[in-house]
């Protein structure tokens, strides 16, 4: 994929004194010189009837399973359309809650009501494409005047700027709010839409676009954004009733929309513009003409076969999870935690189940290093390490609002001893993501003045994750409850299997944290070692290498023993050790434990600690601490940093080593192709899995859990089809013999 080229801008003032960016590449303004914000509201919000559609969506939320609304935009530009849409969404939501509370005489506040009814709250999903994105500085400048013009936009603008991604090709998921998601696809629009549509086609059921914003530069300036190939993808991603709006009334736009099956209508344009176009996707109808050679040709008709479409939609969506379903997640490591979080954020009640406790397995290290394994820039859009890293560091920063920090931005220096890129390939990356430091800078930032650090990769956005703080955050979610239970067997039951069951409670013992749905909706039985049987609608298996014992269709992972070591340095050692995380053939990192960390590991809060790891022993399930693997971790560090030999010897005796060095052993689950399993295990969509992440769980799991939740709820996923195929539970590469 081509490298993203940022927009080249000049600036001018509009009639209201606002600073307006002008594209030097296309020779066109980004929005009207009359009033860009109101142009966005008129052309795209009003003409797509979003105020009425949002109101209807929220009005249904209290009486039925909530719906999602999806908008696709061609031309992100300055983000003004997104901001106006998001602002309207929040206004519609507040209007609904104000009305609902007044009608029901609720004594709680709107915010309390929102928390209590989250399972019925609709969600807004916006997908936008941009070939030449603005730099962060240019975006900030372009939006500054709108913050002054409409102060109610300030929090929306600030949040967008805080989440605005590094300009790397591919899809960047931004969680603007709990119920508002923006997938920003950077790169060629036709390619991005094709990737989106291909991902849609690979799933057993999929989402659709409800409204289109066709907001590229004028056809005379940018023909490629109005090409036939673009409208082919618009057709693939739309359904009958999908609307579209565009400022342009050019013939190429009319013809493209009509070819995509839309009925077009001219309406008054904004400001001095005489007219614009709106459009509605029609129902395809197969018609037979006995007098012609075109028997069975497809035409489009606004009023016919709507009943047929409804029937087809039931078939497509029959296995999709609805917002108020009860879901069990088995396994409370990082995969289970992230699966529970993503599903709970979508309104589902989630029971997180583990035979021991959260973080009892390989995910429970004192700290996890978030630093990607790099790839040449041309491959980055389909490289799971890279796109997961970009999403995860945003995710951890965004949810890090508690007393104890989840993510500490430390930066990381990679010594390129096990790297897929060299310094020349690193130079192609934006400096915000990766760069190479001079020898003096590398020495200064690491504190290693005698070490040869000429070959290096500096990762400015990387840092350390505190697993305990993350687990605590997840477990405070109002839609998540934890249950200790050892699940031994899973029995899926179709609804008709309950016809002979007169009383579900007679055969199922249910604990307080699992709510039994009506019999017709209960589809999965979880059989515990204790004899207790739990009833849920869906189950996600996230039990690492034990996942296969719960469902034989899950790949039997390669089992990798890993031992992480840590110790409390002396004052002399602390002065000599690196001051930031390093990657070499292993990795090391200084950190300071937080209060509460001692509940999971042998650490002392507030005392500087140094960790290093990790061993890598295949097909070994022993979880006892080994002195030999302390030595392995120690030797990896000294091989990379020989100058530390004098100040960091291993303790002389085994007793001293056991006393001064601590460790944790985890058994990691790995696939032959090093990609995790994400998706449905069965054809009915009752049993799912998120597993097999090896040592990359804290990097992969946040994004992969988003993908899983999107698949389960029939929404668009933020991955290209080629990468999605690499995560398939039943992919052909899993047939390769393990070694």
UniProtKB/Swiss-Prot annotation:
The keyword Oxidoreductase applies. It catalyses: 5-aminomethyl-2-thiouridine(34) in tRNA + S-adenosyl-L-methionine = 5-methylaminomethyl-2-thiouridine(34) in tRNA + S-adenosyl-L-homocysteine + H(+). Keywords: Cytoplasm, FAD, Flavoprotein, Methyltransferase, Multifunctional enzyme, Oxidoreductase, S-adenosyl-L-methionine, Transferase, tRNA processing. Residues 330-739 are annotated as: FAD-dependent cmnm(5)s(2)U34 oxidoreductase. It is found in: Cytoplasm. Its cofactor is FAD. Residues 1-282 are annotated as: tRNA (mnm(5)s(2)U34)-methyltransferase. SUPFAM superfamilies: Nucleotide-binding domain (SSF51971). Its EC number is 2.1.1.61, 1.5.-.-. One of its GO terms (cellular component) is cytoplasm. One of its GO terms (biological process) is methylation. The keyword Chloroplast does not apply. GO terms for molecular function: flavin adenine dinucleotide binding; oxidoreductase activity, acting on the CH-NH group of donors; tRNA (5-methylaminomethyl-2-thiouridylate)(34)-methyltransferase activity. In the N-terminal section; belongs to the methyltransferase superfamily. tRNA (mnm(5)s(2)U34)-methyltransferase family. Catalyzes the last two steps in the biosynthesis of 5-methylaminomethyl-2-thiouridine (mnm(5)s(2)U) at the wobble position (U34) in tRNA. Catalyzes the FAD-dependent demodification of cmnm(5)s(2)U34 to nm(5)s(2)U34, followed by the transfer of a methyl group from S-adenosyl-L-methionine to nm(5)s(2)U34, to form mnm(5)s(2)U34. This is tRNA 5-methylaminomethyl-2-thiouridine biosynthesis bifunctional protein MnmC. The lineage of its organism: Bacteria, Pseudomonadati, Pseudomonadota, Gammaproteobacteria, Moraxellales.
């Amino acid at each position: 994929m081509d490298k993203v080229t940022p927009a080249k801008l000049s600036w001018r003032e509009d009639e209201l004194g606002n600073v307006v960016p002008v594209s030097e590449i296309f020779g066109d303004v980004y929005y009207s010189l009359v009033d860009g914000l109101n142009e966005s509201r008129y052309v795209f919000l009003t003409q797509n009837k979003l105020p009425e559609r949002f109101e209807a969506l929220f009005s249904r939320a209290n009486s039925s399973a909530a719906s999602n609304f999806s908008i696709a935009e061609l031309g992100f530009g300055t983000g003004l359309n997104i901001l106006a849409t998001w602002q309207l969404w929040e206004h519609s939501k507040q209007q609904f809650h104000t009305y609902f509370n007044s009608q029901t005489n609720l004594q709680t506040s709107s915010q309390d009501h929102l928390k209590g009814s989250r399972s019925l709250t609709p969600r807004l999903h916006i997908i936008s494409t941009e070939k030449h994105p603005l730099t962060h500085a240019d975006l900030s400048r372009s939006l500054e005047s709108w913050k002054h013009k409409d102060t109610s936009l300030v929090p929306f603008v600030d949040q967008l700027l805080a989440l605005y991604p590094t300009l790397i090709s591919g899809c960047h998921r931004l969680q603007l709010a709990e119920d508002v998601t923006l997938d920003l696809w950077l790169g060629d629009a036709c390619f991005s839409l094709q990737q989106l549509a291909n991902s849609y086609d690979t799933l057993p059921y999929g989402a659709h676009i409800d409204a289109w914003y066709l907001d590229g530069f004028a056809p005379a300036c940018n023909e490629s954004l109005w090409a036939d190939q673009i409208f082919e993808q618009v057709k693939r991603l739309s359904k009958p009733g999908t609307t579209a709006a565009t400022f342009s009334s050019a013939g190429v736009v009319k013809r493209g929309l009509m070819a995509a099956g839309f009925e077009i209508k001219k309406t008054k344009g904004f400001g001095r513009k005489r007219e614009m176009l709106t459009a509605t996707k029609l129902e395809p109808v197969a018609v037979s003409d006995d007098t012609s050679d075109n028997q069975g040709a497809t035409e489009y008709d606004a009023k016919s076969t709507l009943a047929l479409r409804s029937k087809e939609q039931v078939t497509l969506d029959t296995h999709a999870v609805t917002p108020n379903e009860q879901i069990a997640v088995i396994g409370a490591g990082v995969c289970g935690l992230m699966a529970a979080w993503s599903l709970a954020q979508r309104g589902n009640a989630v029971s997180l189940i583990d035979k021991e406790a959260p973080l009892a397995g390989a995910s429970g290290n004192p700290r996890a290093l978030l630093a990607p394994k790099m790839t040449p820039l041309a491959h980055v859009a389909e490289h799971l390490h890279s796109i997961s890293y970009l999403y995860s560091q945003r995710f951890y920063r965004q949810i890090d609002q508690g007393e104890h920090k989840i993510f500490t931005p430390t930066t990381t220096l990679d010594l390129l001893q096990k790297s897929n890129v060299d310094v020349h390939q690193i130079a192609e990356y934006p400096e915000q993501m990766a760069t190479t430091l001079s020898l003096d800078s590398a020495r200064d930032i690491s504190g290693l003045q005698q070490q040869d650090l000429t070959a290096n990769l500096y990762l400015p956005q990387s840092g350390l994750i505190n697993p305990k703080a993350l687990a605590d955050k997840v477990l405070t979610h109002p839609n998540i409850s934890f249950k200790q239970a050892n699940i031994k067997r899973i029995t899926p039951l179709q609804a008709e299997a309950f016809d002979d069951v007169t009383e579900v409670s007679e055969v199922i013992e249910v604990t307080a944290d699992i709510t039994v749905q009506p019999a017709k909706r209960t589809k999965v039985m979880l059989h515990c070692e204790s004899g207790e049987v739990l009833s849920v609608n869906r189950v996600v298996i996230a039990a690492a290498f034990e996942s296969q014992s719960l469902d034989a269709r899950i790949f039997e992972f390669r089992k990798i023993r890993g031992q992480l070591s840590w110790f409390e340095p002396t004052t002399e050692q602390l002065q000599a050790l690196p001051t930031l995380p390093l990657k070499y053939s292993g990795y090391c990192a200084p950190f300071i434990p937080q209060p509460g960390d001692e509940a999971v590991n042998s650490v002392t809060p507030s005392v500087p600690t140094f960790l290093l790891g990790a061993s890598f022993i295949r097909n070994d399930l022993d979880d006892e601490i080994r002195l030999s693997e302390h030595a392995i971790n120690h030797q990896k560090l000294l091989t990379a940093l020989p100058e530390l030999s004098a100040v960091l010897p291993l303790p002389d005796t085994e007793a001293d080593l056991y006393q001064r060095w601590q460790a944790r052993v985890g058994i990691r689950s790995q696939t032959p192709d090093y990609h995790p399993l994400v998706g449905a295990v069965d054809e009915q969509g009752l049993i799912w899995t998120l597993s097999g992440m090896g040592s990359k769980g804290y990097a992969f799991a946040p994004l992969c859990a988003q993908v899983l939740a999107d698949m389960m709820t029939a929404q668009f996923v933020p991955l290209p089809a080629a990468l999605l195929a690499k995560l398939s539970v039943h992919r052909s590469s899993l047939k390769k013999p393990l070694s």
